[in-house]
Amino acid sequence: MYSIYNHTTGQYGTIYHTLTAARAMAHAYSLWAKNDRDVIDMQTGEVMSQFSKGKETYRAKG
């Protein structure tokens, strides 16, 4: 399971069952709010993607 971390508020958001859904929502939220969001793997704590103002700036392999 994956969650979205909001850099502005320091809070985690909704839990998503698929990485694709989490990345899509992080992209949308980042674009809409013009801020940074991370997609976090809830089991390992690994950052899977980072978005900055709607652009994906990092993507983990896998």
Question: What does each model-found stretch correspond to?
Answer:
Residues 29-62:
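Short, mixed-charge low-complexity intrinsically disordered segments
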Residues 1-13, 21, 38-41, 53, ...:
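Short aromatic-glycine-(Arg/Gly/Cys) micro-motifs in beta-strand/loop hairpins
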Residues 17-27:
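Charged, amphipathic alpha-helical segments
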